[in-house]
Amino acid sequence: MVDAESIKIVFSDVDGTFVDDEHHPIPESGAIIRAVADRVPICLVSARSPEGLYPIQQALGFNGPLACYSGAYVLDEEGNELLSSTIPLADALEIKAYLERELPHITVGTYGFHTWIVDSRSDPRIMREEYLVMATSKASRDLAGEFGERGVHKFLLMGEPKDILQAQQMVSERFPHLTAVRSSDILCEVMAGDVSKSRAVQLLCEHYGVTPEQAVAFGDGQNDIDMLSAVEQSYAMANAEPEVKLAAAHEVPWTNAECGVARMLEQLLLG
């Protein structure tokens, strides 16, 4: 068992890890999460926007830093920006035009800072995403007007599994300087090439004056592997993909729906 005194910071993926199968926070885990957050920072590391993470913190009653858009936008516990890595506007406009032309059957959401725009809020895929992340999009095609020269943090591609696999391959080939990763079989995230969860972990460790050896991290998907590899004590959820379990140092005995992160943290830090 890991020594509780050696753990100084916690990193956790969100969907498939920190929330239930409906992608919503589990109230029963709140008391444990609050007790842990009183001792060490709990950092949510997710492909979600800040607005997709705030409701989780609010529902469980804790505060902490956020690594949004898979590490492209990192905020401290007071909401101050620690890192912003964007796709320049000119590139973003080219990417959006390419997606509309070559992949018209894919639904695209565009995210930057605290803004999420879509072509149509009545698109069933957008409606589903709004429900899952408890955030609201804005109908707009005006990337330049919405984001300006600050650029965008990510494009979210939504579609059927075979189409998303094809989209990831096509975007990676057409824009090799970008990062295109599937966060599920129906979602692909497209971000600047230097974006990674592990980079956010390193930055937040430095910000809090701790080392990766003093960190614990939880994840379930392939896009969590680099984060799990960046810390000493890494945990794959019971529901994690096989490759993730191989990459992690430990396995949580419980799934996300069984409050696995909270129960593991209770053993590690409150036991």
Regions found by a protein language model. Give the residues of each.
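Non-catalytic pre-domain segments flanking phosphatase-related domains
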Residues: 1-12, 31, 35
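Mg2+-dependent phosphoryl-transfer enzymes with acidic/Ser/Thr/Gly-rich catalytic loops
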Residues: 2-7, 25-26, 189-271
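Active-site phosphate-binding/coordination module
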Residues: 21-125
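Hydrophobic packing residues within well-ordered alpha-helices of enzyme cores
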Residues: 29, 53-57, 167, 171, ...
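Short active-site oxyanion
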Residues: 39-43, 62-64, 153-154, 213-214, ...
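Short, structured coil segments at secondary-structure junctions
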Residues: 60-62, 70, 174-176, 230-231, ...
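Conserved acidic, metal-coordinating active-site core of Asp-based
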Residues: 105-218, 222-230
